């Protein structure tokens, strides 16, 4: 009999209950007890949703991030929070976001907030984790209380529980040594704590534990490969059964290593590594389980169940009870329930599967393998009809778009002149001071903004009323920026619910869900649009709002667009053509918007490519092809303008050292980047690479409510000036200010502008 299980479930709730509960607690509007009760309620609901599985995950729920949870389980707290006392949950939030609830901070042993932990992308997804911090003298100590609490809840509910933990080698790999020490040198101190954790789970009656080691799908050198052998040899003596889980890619050169480790089962991502399944079935020792991730845990399209059974059936015959079935990875990366989508186009809806529907697909596959296809004939027939409908729908294919793609040539991505000739023309047109100040684009999304948007979508506010409300918010943003004496202004993006969804709503080839939310980090959720067909732009998308904002001021007003690579990487993308083709389609559509903004007199146009890096394949050998079409797509979008129009781009959570040449090849006049959480460490990339254009290293962390001081900003910019000529430096926050409050934004930007004025006097 085939065993079914799941690697992880979305934690936010079908209607984002966790998001709202967290934000109430942080604002002091609810108690710690209420937040913990909400967590327990969500866990109970999610285990009930997974009741048909043979094994359900436990420990996949986190109030902020599963890697941060693991840091607390291992007793690895940053030194800066160790002086705080009180409830561990408040310390947890201090590490995650710099502070906990206001009431907790008022009674803390130390005063004020602390620096939030560094946050970065989880492999090549749009989820973010809090980076573990290490020093040469880091010690570990077991605190299993969070995991044991969840395990007790699951067992009381009758759940066949499979605890999920981040593996020891991946945990070290995900972290950063703050003193440049060797992370692997900590492995001998870490392994006894993992051993004690496994013993603790055994004592609670746990039969199987899932240990996630996704770095096995990356390129590992000999030292990291040896770390796996050392780690699992040390853990082998434990009585608990270990399912080693990999996902997001192929094992390739690590396949022999993975099959040789002394564990009881191995999970592989059969969506990305389908070609490796047969080799794994051959090479895995005869007593071990092979868990096959046959359902895509990262995208929302229905699985072709009949085609999947065609290759699973011979595997099941070969492996028998040793075959387990699961999604390819945790379902954290997809929305919860398609049944909530009452307004989604019926035809498109029939092509989709969210988390609960993926579990249904899993059940159909298992039943077909265990009892024969006849037992699920109706489900298989319905699935086949949906697959056929999508494949042959005229809504998916647009001949005019395909013809435009065929006409793309190299000249389409070239500016009229090189940067050295463009820069003087832009300087003359814009007349900016040294260290010009700007923001990244968005200002706080107030309750009034959200209410107006909600009323407009519900039909209780007409278009004229909505436009008036948005114009009032835009004017407020402009007046605040003028009062702050910022140099290049933005309109604030009041009309935009999301930097990707906003554009997707106005492009043909996209569809939109009501409740298709996925977690990005903490309480931050995104609702990726659904790219189902060929992309085109029926009409201008932003020109009306930007030109209105420009009419309110004589200062330069940035046009704000999201770039094609980011729209692609932050969408649920069709899987029936190469991603590069979809990206080129987006590039042509956004290019039309860039040219319309220029015609309307907009002097500065920002094209955000926040997600450029996250699209990189996990293996460096595959980077070249991705970067080629990603950079080409940006250049097609941006480079139709005249020399005196200044093109900005923004990237966040990115490390640049290894792709700096490709970023330079994008040829944006100004690039703004996230650097404050890493203390300008990202600028190390410029030590050995002379970046030719202008750059704005982010000077304060907008993901934390803490207010940066003028002195801190000056210090960061002086560090930047050691690597970048001062005349090519801009002063700006790390990212957009959408998630902050005006009461936080005004003092932060006041200090930022004051710092820029100080720099103009101090730095030559």
From Swiss-Prot:
It is an enzyme of class 2 (transferase). GO terms for biological process: methionine biosynthetic process; methylation. L-methionine binds at residues 440-442, 493, 608. Its EC number is 2.1.1.14. Catalyzes the transfer of a methyl group from 5-methyltetrahydrofolate to homocysteine resulting in methionine formation. This is 5-methyltetrahydropteroyltriglutamate--homocysteine methyltransferase. Pfam families: Meth_synt_1, Meth_synt_2. The active site is at residue 703. Its cofactor is Zn(2+). It catalyses: 5-methyltetrahydropteroyltri-L-glutamate + L-homocysteine = tetrahydropteroyltri-L-glutamate + L-methionine. Binds 1 zinc ion per subunit. CDD domains: CIMS_C_terminal_like (cd03311), CIMS_N_terminal_like (cd03312). It comes from Burkholderia lata (strain ATCC 17760 / DSM 23089 / LMG 22485 / NCIMB 9086 / R18194 / 383). Pathway: Amino-acid biosynthesis; L-methionine biosynthesis via de novo pathway; L-methionine from L-homocysteine (MetE route): step 1/1. L-homocysteine binds at residues 440-442, 493, 608.
